[in-house]
């Protein structure tokens, strides 16, 4: 693996973690907002208390099971570590760079696969590489936009 490939992989990992952190953070805030808004419906003359209660319960279960806020925090921390490695990269030897990159990869979060093509495109754009990968599907583009980055 040559130095350019390592640098590309570091940038790719940084943008993947950054998008995943943003996406899961936004999902968590949206769910929290809907729970609070639905809870306020109890004080207003709303029919269908059963439906509102079921919605609140379902969203609360989603938050507990999927732990979007925790996933966001872990991914944001990894993105910061990758950014620090990007900053330190010019001063590091190839062996040192590869060693630090492998160390970071060992504790990576598990971002959704739908974000990977967008992260690949973003890393290509940032490094000035020609991107020959396929166009993003509508799902990938939507998730990338919700994740705060839709590379062209």
Question: Residue ranges of each PLM-predicted region?
Answer:
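Alpha-helical transmembrane segments and their immediate juxtamembrane boundary regions
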Residues: 21-73
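Cytosol-facing regions at membranes
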Residues: 1-27, 69-152
């Amino acid at each position: 693996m040559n130095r350019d490939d390592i640098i590309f992989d570091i940038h790719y990992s940084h943008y993947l973690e950054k998008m995943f952190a943003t996406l899961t953070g936004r999902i968590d805030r949206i769910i929290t907002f809907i729970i609070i808004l639905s809870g306020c419906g109890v004080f207003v003359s709303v029919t269908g208390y059963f439906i509102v209660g079921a919605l609140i319960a379902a969203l609360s279960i989603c938050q507990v099971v999927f732990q979007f806020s925790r996933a966001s925090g872990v991914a944001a921390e990894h993105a910061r570590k990758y950014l620090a490695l990007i900053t330190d990269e010019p001063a590091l030897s190839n062996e040192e760079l590869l060693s630090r990159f492998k160390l970071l990869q060992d504790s990576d979060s598990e971002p959704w696969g739908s974000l990977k093509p967008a992260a690949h495109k973003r890393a290509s754009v940032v490094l000035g590489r020609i991107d020959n990968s396929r166009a993003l599907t509508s799902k990938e583009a939507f998730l990338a936009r919700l994740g705060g980055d839709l590379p062209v």
